[in-house]
Regions:
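Structural preference for solvent-exposed beta-strand-turn elements
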Residues: 1-320
Length: 320
């Protein structure tokens, strides 16, 4: 965080139990960081995605470490769901991208990701009240330092579940070799369901890190990941459960106009995040429960979130 912020002050108490952190302006620019191997790159990207549009200069962040693990959102999931979501709020352009240069599984890492994001002065309000029906499913089955057949076995088992519901399914295999394959063996699957209204719902699973717990079969991983996607589709909404907090933050920071967003059941993380929004921005959301009719077959109960943005303006942005 200190790499991209013009720091004012960081003080650590002598006993190491207290940290005083006073940030300055969000400077941005080109940064490189070797992420701690206790968490994956997705853990760091979650914060970067929230801050990147409000930098002084366009951000180019090169992050090295673990790209895929069972704990944090993987880079594949963030690229497939978060970037399209942010584009709905007006955060887009040629310089908005997330690339996997090297793939690194837990626990050794060795992956590399490049995230680029333009700056924006304001965030536009949104009206996302209808998710629409699922029109297609896409995915990536990745593997490193194991047999390439692992990816094919994952794809076959996942399709065995999903083909019962929709024919338009394409899951490609990504097997990186040599220097691009990181330091640890592993495999996994990321699935994304796209709706007729351009909403994205996702699910993912990764193999157990080497030396940690019982190994998982690729067939079991593929089937279980497909079932997780079906559960996410049942929950529904215009944003999947892993990205609810980001969408609500962008609604809060939007122009002083009404924004509406239809979500599935709120996750515990999102509920706590709403408390933070209330404390820091004094914004309270109007929450309406939407119960689908029995003949609609639209999954579980939904929640319509409504708020008026604070009208945040990016004062860090360079004037040209």
């Amino acid at each position: 965080m200190a790499h991209m912020i013009m720091m004012r002050k960081i003080l650590i108490e002598k006993m190491g139990a207290v940290l005083f952190y006073q940030p300055g302006l969000l400077y941005g620019g080109s940064i490189e960081h070797d992420c701690n191997l206790q968490r994956s790159i997705g853990y760091y990207l979650e914060a970067l995605l929230m801050l990147a549009p409000f930098m002084k200069n366009p951000l180019k962040a090169t992050l090295r470490g673990i790209t895929n693990d069972p704990t944090d959102p993987t880079v594949d999931r963030l690229k497939s769901t978060v970037l399209p979501l942010m584009k709905k709020f007006g955060i887009e352009g040629e310089g908005f991208d997330l690339k996997v240069m090297k793939r690194g599984m837990a626990p050794g890492g060795g992956g590399e990701v490049v995230f680029t994001c333009p700056v924006r002065k304001t965030i536009r309000p949104v009206q996302l009240t209808d998710s629409g029906k699922i029109k297609r499913i896409r995915g990536v089955a990745y593997s490193v330092r194991v047999s390439p057949q692992m990816g094919n076995r994952i794809v076959e088992s996942a399709r065995g579940v999903l083909n019962q519901f929709i024919p338009d399914i394409y899951i490609h295999t990504d097997h990186m070799k040599g220097a691009n394959s990181g330091k640890s063996p592993g495999f996994g699957l990321t699935l994304v369901a796209e709706t007729l209204e351009g909403c994205f719902l996702s699910a993912e699973m990764s193999s157990t890190p080497q030396g940690q717990g019982d190994p998982v079969l690729p067939e079991d991983l593929g089937r279980n990941c497909a079932k997780l996607l079906l559960e996410e589709v049942y929950r529904g909404g215009c944003v999947d459960s892993s990205n609810q907090s980001l969408a609500l933050l962008l609604m809060t920071l939007g122009q002083q106009d009404v924004s509406k967003l239809l979500l599935g059941p709120l996750s515990p993380y999102t509920i706590e995040f709403l408390r933070h929004i209330r404390d820091f921005f004094q914004i309270m959301f109007k929450i309406e429960v939407r119960k689908p009719l029995e003949d609609e077959r639209k999954g579980g109960d939904k929640v319509l979130m409504t708020c008026v943005g604070v009208g945040y303006s990016n004062l860090n942005k360079s004037l040209k």
